[in-house]
Amino acid sequence: MAKKVFIKTFGCQMNEYDSDKMADVLHAAQGYEPTQNVEEADLILFNTCSVREKAQEKVFSDLGRVKHLKARGVRIGVGGCVASQEGAEIIRRAPYVDVVFGPQTLHRLPELLQQRERLDQPQIDISFPEIEKFDHLPAASVQGASAFVSIMEGCSKYCSYCVVPYTRGEEVSRPLDDVLVEVAGLADQGVKEVTLLGQNVNAYRGRMGSTAQRADLALLLDYVAGIPGVERIRYTTSHPNEFTPRLIEAYARLPKLANHLHLPVQHGSDRILMAMKRGYTAMEYKSTVRKLRAIRPDLALSSDFIVGFPGETQDDFDKLMRLIAEVHFDNSFSFVFSPRPGTPAAGLPDDTPHEVKLRRLQQLQGVIDTHIRSISASRVGTVQRILVEGASRRDAAELMGRTECNRVVNFAGPPHLVGQMVELTITEARAYTLRGQYCAQESPQATMAA
């Protein structure tokens, strides 16, 4: 009987990708099969996120909940950014943990587990071997018509509030050929949509063959768009400073490039942006957005926002709200500032009461929600091309998929549509999703906006 592994993922899409790779590595090396039931697992892994304190502390809370399973010989591992940041401190706080491994060493997980058995003591590997991880990963397993592909690791921007450069290391890009081989392999297995991943994905500079030349993200997108079977391309997460004219032009020449972009601005006050060490002004951000929407007028934008950064005044917050009103974001991920140990911002003086920060966050989220509802309502009556991902979460008898602009659509349709690109007429706008009607016959050209 095959051993089973339970993996709980915290945080970003890069962590989701890494969790899939953990499962692939364990299956290839030791025959583990994934399970969603922690009670039947032989191995429990937490793939962690340290971007915010709440997520970090939840890891230790979850560890406590599975501690009792050690009585029947279950092994427990902690990976991801908390593992990289805390290292041996995890073993000190939770001595029943068997292995601790960083984002760059997940490929060594089978070896670490073997060493745990042989040496009868916890194992820790949070080193940063440059790109070695990708050289030792098995072929990707396909679980649908969409897939993540990591094209680079780490970040070299060192924003004053962010732990990513310390937990995932400096930027390292995968060679161009390696990425293309992985995408082509996924397409051969039926994947129609790929999302290219990186902490700072548009800083990609992949080696081209044996030459000294480097491919940027714009060139990589050209190559990926030419791979047979790939019908839609996404990428995340972008940094405004790396948005080159070539990348902007890609939206004009590549119809396969999805009509959605996650481009975190973080704030709308130049003073706060400078304190964050973001490297751009609000005006420069809006200029990039204008250039993009000159090519794709209905381009859907989403962003991260940090409210209550140390020293944020009411005037600073008002500037943030003005930027939001001007840009009209389609979605957001907004949070109150969470000081992370070891970052410059953690030591900045902060005299803004927490209740004021919470009130500002609620105000921001209320405005964004109004934008989302307005955009959704404008889609009613349009025809949208979606990738059908599977059963609807609302009703298992129905299907769901995503539009070009990453909006979820639920609809009634035959099961054989799963994994296909289909056209739907949008019939209803709900809070954060759409409802559509399947157009079984050939329909008019689908609009790009949704």
UniProtKB/Swiss-Prot annotation:
Gene Ontology CC terms: cytosol
Catalytic activity: N(6)-dimethylallyladenosine(37) in tRNA + (sulfur carrier)-SH + AH2 + 2 S-adenosyl-L-methionine = 2-methylsulfanyl-N(6)-dimethylallyladenosine(37) in tRNA + (sulfur carrier)-H + 5'-deoxyadenosine + L-methionine + A + S-adenosyl-L-homocysteine + 2 H(+)
One Gene Ontology molecular-function label: metal ion binding
UniProt keyword list: 4Fe-4S, Cytoplasm, Iron, Iron-sulfur, Metal-binding, S-adenosyl-L-methionine, Transferase, tRNA processing
UniProt-annotated binding residues for [4Fe-4S] cluster 1: C12, C49, C81
Xref: SUPFAM superfamilies: Radical SAM enzymes (SSF102114)
Transmembrane segments: none
Cofactor binding annotation: Binds 2 [4Fe-4S] clusters. One cluster is coordinated with 3 cysteines and an exchangeable S-adenosyl-L-methionine.
Binding positions ([4Fe-4S] cluster 2): C155, C159, C162
EC number(s) reported in the record: 2.8.4.3
Cofactor(s) of this protein: [4Fe-4S] cluster
One Pfam family linked to the record: UPF0004
Residue span(s) of domain TRAM: 377-440
EC class: transferase
Major site of localization recorded for this protein: cytoplasm
Family, per entry: Belongs to the methylthiotransferase family. MiaB subfamily.
PANTHER family in the record: CDK5 REGULATORY SUBUNIT-ASSOCIATED PROTEIN 1, MITOCHONDRIAL TRNA METHYLTHIOTRANSFERASE CDK5RAP1
NCBIfam families: miaB-methiolase, MiaB/RimO family radical SAM methylthiotransferase
Protein name from the UniProt record: tRNA-2-methylthio-N(6)-dimethylallyladenosine synthase
